[in-house]
Amino acid sequence: VKLSRVVWLVVLILIIAGLTYFFYPPFRLFTFVVAGRSPVCPLGEAVKAPDNLRRQVEYKDQILRASRLVEEDPKGFELWQTPNGRYWIPAGSRYVLPFNLAEQERKIYGTGDFGPHAGDITLDCGANVGVTVHEELAAGAKTVVAIEPAPENIECLRRNYASEIQSGRVIIVSKGVWDRDDFLTLRVDPKNSAADSFVIHREGAVDVDKIPLTTIDEIVADLKLPRVDYIKLDIEGAEPKALAGARETLAHYKPRISIATYHEPDHPRVIPELIRAAQPGYEMRCGPCAETDHALRPDVLYFK
């Protein structure tokens, strides 16, 4: 009888634990950390993952409702008025802009010690149409080098920052960042201008041949930049390649870095290794985390 009671008690505990796992996300995420399925995300960031998703959707929907189409260009561009200002975007990507603006509301690329500062010279790698360029300028950056390979995004950058380009505060580099000078095929997503990639194959993407690539080190040398204070890297899976071409810049200037780590499963491990190989003095902090495939991964990592 006693054994039977023990068995039933164990079964009851397992049922309660199972229900809690599925219906109470913080407990599930806690188990990921305990089980080693969150090798980079600390417990404090891990339990925020459901709220990160909720806030992203909430902000995106708010921005979308508050935005309106101002102008359509038959060349394939649209001008939108948003709560965060006016932006030219590629036609077909109208739902991408609110999503990217929502990410900035959440400050996913960091603030304070890990974000852009007043007087900075920044490299915005994967500038897209300029949402993060706006954030860097708003923080008081002296010079923003907007690096973007996709032709339609480059045109939007030129329209969105015409006056800043004229004054020299924004410099556009119409190339991708890689580990060497080269020309590669860029896979352009006609429905998501933020998903164009040299390395990720997405269904429906259109190949654009002979897109030029260069390295961060060469950009710094070619522009004769006196220093680099901050780098944002979100380039659809090519982040390790870009870091391999930035060793001198990281070693000499030790810029603050905000880097996307969600494109490939091994990036949360590989990216810190590459950064510290170039400059061992970097301190790392985990940014917002997300649940994926019964594990937790950081969307962004910060280095200073």
Language model regions located:
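Phosphate/nucleotide-binding beta-alpha loop and adjacent structural elements of enzyme active sites
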Residues: 1-304
